[in-house]
From Swiss-Prot:
Similarity section: Belongs to the AB hydrolase superfamily.
One Pfam family hit: Abhydrolase_6
Active-site residues per Swiss-Prot or TrEMBL entry: 156, 349
Function per UniProt: Demethylates proteins that have been reversibly carboxymethylated. Demethylates PPP2CB (in vitro) and PPP2CA. Binding to PPP2CA displaces the manganese ion and inactivates the enzyme.
Protein name: Protein phosphatase methylesterase 1
Region (Disordered): 1-38, 255-280
Gene: Ppme1
Coiled coil regions, renumbered to chain: none
Subunit structure: Binds PPP2CA and PPP2CB.
Any one GO BP annotation for this protein: regulation of sodium ion transport
Basic and acidic residues bias (residue ranges): 268-280
Organism of this sequence: Rattus norvegicus
Keywords: Hydrolase, Methylation, Phosphoprotein, Serine esterase
Length: 386
């Protein structure tokens, strides 16, 4: 493993592996928790951060797709927010509250296909081209032929899709572009170990609280406030799924049924039904999307991304969790002044969740600097040195 890949993994992957059974068990409840200290892992509704929610219908060749968006603000440019792989529009919740208080703008946070509450006919097609078209179609469905000024802001996979959307000119009123912690070089290096990372995650959780607790204690999201609203969009409640214990009981019951005579089979069937009922009471939660199955699209998201980003003829902003993430093309581009860059240290990969206020300040400063938006609430720009 190269030094570059090692340094990338330290910020991008969880800082330590989850404790055995932490996804849904109470084994990790005392981990590094002082006596009497207790944190609240209960989920928080989207309505505490966004003003409204809308399901946008889009017509295409396969029929009608429905894309979930969360909105805030009524004036100024539209900040169209695209989440990372496996996340949802709710990952932008805390950032939304922060940016709305700094500049006059409108927020549209979109659940990309196969993520969150978006429903599409062909949920297996996660190619960069298809998702970029989705973004353009949603803008057209919401605003018609005369869309307001739009700035695309994307994190990780969403950052790649934002660049593909901009490069294909699918949003005619696009005025700016922002990528958050996604760089072609480090992203391509990370793909080799991504399956191992995904296999290391818990497959199910006993409750939303357990999912939120795992996300924070594993380091996936370092900001508890964001995790309490964001994880709701990452997991779903399963109907009819069986836990390992219940599965074992059912299998043992089937074996026993084969060995029993007709008189005993009735009692075995009764036990099996009781096991099934007990399982349904648990209703474990699992991930909304199986990211491991999307592997064939990963290369298409990130290959050639740096040059594609540099080629977009609009003001550009790159926010990174560490300067070590820069690849050769972006390093040269940054030295030539082709985009604005800001490093936000002490963050994990989910920069906008870990440090929503800092990201909001960077985006607000970018908007004001280019005269795309007006400051509100006495917000003062602090221009970065890099």
């Amino acid at each position: 493993m190269s030094a570059l890949e090692k340094s990338m993994h330290l910020g991008r992957l969880p800082s330590r592996p989850p404790l055995p059974g932490s996804g849904g068990s109470q084994s990790g409840a005392k981990m590094r928790m002082g006596p009497g200290r207790k944190r609240d892992f209960t989920p928080v509704p989207w309505s505490q951060y966004f003003e409204s929610m809308e399901d946008v219908e889009v017509e295409n060749e396969t029929g009608k797709d429905t894309f979930r968006v969360y909105k805030s603000g009524s004036e100024g440019p539209v900040l169209l927010l695209l989440h990372g792989g496996g996340h949802s529009a709710l990952s932008w919740a805390v950032f939304t509250a922060a940016i709305i208080s700094r500049v006059q703008c409108r927020i549209v946070a979109l659940d990309l296909r196969s993520h969150g509450e978006t429903k599409v006919k062909n949920s297996e097609d996660l190619s960069a081209e298809t998702m970029a078209k989705d973004v353009g179609n949603v803008v057209e469905a919401m605003y018609g032929d005369l869309p307001p000024p739009v700035m695309l802001i994307g994190h990780s996979m969403g950052g790649a899709i934002a660049v593909h959307t901009a490069a294909a000119n699918l949003v005619p009123s696009l005025l700016g572009l922002c990528m958050i912690d996604v760089v072609e070089g480090t992203a391509m290096d990370a793909l080799n170990s991504m399956q191992n990372f995904l296999r290391g995650r818990p497959k199910t959780f006993k409750s939303l609280e357990n999912a939120i607790e795992w996300s924070v204690k594993s380091g996936q999201i370092r900001n508890l406030e964001s995790a309490r609203v964001s994880m709701v969009g990452q997991v779903k409640q399963c109907e009819g799924i069986t836990s390992p214990e219940s599965s074992k009981s059912i299998v043992e019951g089937i074996i026993e049924e084969e060995e029993e005579d007709e008189e005993g089979s009735e009692s075995v069937n009764k036990r099996k039904k009781e096991d099934d009922m007990e399982t349904k009471k648990d209703h474990p939660y699992t991930w909304r999307i199986e990211l491991a199955k999307t592997e064939k699209y990963w290369d298409g998201w990130f290959r050639g991304l740096s040059n594609l980003f540099l080629s977009c003829p609009i003001p550009k902003l790159l926010l990174l969790a560490g300067v070590d993430r820069l690849d050769k093309d972006l390093t040269i581009g940054q030295m030539q002044g082709k985009f604005q860059m800001q490093v936000l240290p002490q963050c994990g990969h989910a920069v906008h969740e870990d440090a929503p206020d800092k990201v909001a300040e960077a985006v607000a400063t970018f908007l004001i600097r280019h005269r795309f938006a007006e400051p509100i609430g006495g917000f003062q720009c602090v221009f970065p040195g890099c």
